Amino acid sequence: SGSITKSRDVRTQAVFSLRGKPLNSYGLSKSVVYENEEFNCLQAALNIEDGLDELRYNKVIIATDADVDGMHIRLLMLTFFLQFFPDLVKKGHVYILQTPLFRVKNKKEIRYCYSEEERLQAIEDLKPNPEITRFKGLGEISPDEFKGFIGKGIRLDQVCLRKEDAVSDLLGFYMGKNTMERQNFIINNLVVEEDVE
C-alpha cells in the first residue's frame, strides 16, 4: 500500500493496509469481527459497528494486485462485508479499484492500459517500437504514477447485488464446499491470458 498511501489526497482519502491475506470469514459468527485484529480495526476505521449511519467514507474501495492472489484477497474482503455488513454492499458503498496492467510508452507519450485491447491499441498508436511494461503488482507502480490512478481519472467497479441475489446463496456458491456446479462455473468462465514481457 506504499504507493497508494504516498499518493492519496489526505483530505479525502484514507488507506487501510491489510497484513497478508484476510481470514476467510465464511460461515463464522460475528464474534470473529472482534476476535480478529484486522477485522476489528477495519470495522472501527469505517465506523460501522452499529450500522451505516455513522459510516466514515462514502466509498470503500478494495485495491489489490491484479493477479490470482489479489483476486483471492478481493473475494475474502467481499465475503467479510457480505457476511457481516451486507448493507454496505447493498447500498452501493463498496468498489474495486481498477489499476493498469500495462504501461506502453515511446519518447513522446505514455499510455496506461487496463486491458489487453487497450495494450494492443497503444502499441499500434505508439509504434514503431514502444516500450511495454507489465505491472504485476501495485508495488511496481511509483507514487507519482499512482496519483493519476486514484485522482479524478479513478476507474472503479461498483460491487452490486441484484434484488434477487440472496447473500447466503452467493456466499455458499463462491465460498462453500467445492461443488461440481462451482467447478463447472470456473471452467466455463476461465480466462487464460498471455504473460507479456
Model-derived regions, located:
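Conserved phosphate-chemistry cores used by DNA topoisomerases
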Residues: 1-197
